[in-house]
C-alpha cells in the first residue's frame, strides 16, 4: 500500500488539473497563436508562469485504484500488475483468462 498522503496528493493534483484545464489550454493557445500580438503572448506567458505547477497535467502520475501503487500500472484496468494478477487468478476480472496454447 502506498502512503495515504501520496494518494491524497495525487488526488489533489487531479482536481487542480481538472479545474484549471480550460484556462491553461486557452493561455497555451494564445502563446502558440500566430495572429496574436507579442504583448498579448507575453501576458499569457506570465499568466501561465504564475499558475500553480500542480495544475499542469504533466505532473500527474497514474496510480492503482486499489493500492495506490505508482509503478506497474495497467491503463486498461486502472490497477497495478500485482492486483491484476491476483484478481485475474480469482476470476474477478470479466473476460480475462489464463493463456494456454
UniProtKB/Swiss-Prot annotation:
Q: Name one GO biological process term.
A: translation
Which domain of life, per UniProt? Bacteria
Pfam families listed in its UniProt record: Ribosomal_S14
This protein's record includes keyword Ribonucleoprotein: yes
Keyword Amino-acid biosynthesis belongs to the record: no
Q: Name one GO molecular function term.
A: structural constituent of ribosome
| InterPro entries from the UniProt entry | Ribosomal_uS14 (IPR001209), Ribosomal_uS14_bac/plastid (IPR023036), Ribosomal_uS14_CS (IPR018271)
An example Gene Ontology cellular component term from the record?
small ribosomal subunit
Disulphide bond pairs? none
Could you list this entry's UniProt keywords, alphabetically sorted. Answer: Ribonucleoprotein, Ribosomal protein, RNA-binding, rRNA-binding
Task: Provide the assembly information.
Answer: Part of the 30S ribosomal subunit. Contacts proteins S3 and S10.
Similarity section: Belongs to the universal ribosomal protein uS14 family.
Function, as annotated, reads: Binds 16S rRNA, required for the assembly of 30S particles and may also be responsible for determining the conformation of the 16S rRNA at the A site.
Q: Give the protein's recorded name.
A: Small ribosomal subunit protein uS14
* Native organism: Chlamydia pneumoniae
Amino acid at each position: 500500500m502506498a502512503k495515504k498522503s501520496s494518494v491524497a496528493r495525487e488526488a489533489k493534483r487531479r482536481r487542480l488539473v481538472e479545474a484549471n484545464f480550460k484556462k491553461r489550454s486557452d493561455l497555451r493557445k494564445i502563446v502558440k497563436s500566430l495572429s496574436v500580438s507579442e504583448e498579448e503572448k507575453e501576458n499569457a506567458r506570465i499568466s501561465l508562469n504564475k499558475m500553480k505547477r500542480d495544475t499542469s497535467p504533466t505532473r500527474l502520475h497514474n496510480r492503482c485504484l486499489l493500492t495506490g501503487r505508482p509503478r506497474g500500472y495497467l491503463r486498461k484496468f486502472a490497477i497495478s500488475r500485482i492486483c491484476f494478477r491476483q484478481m485475474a487468478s480469482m476470476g474477478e476480472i470479466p473476460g480475462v483468462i489464463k493463456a494456454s496454447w
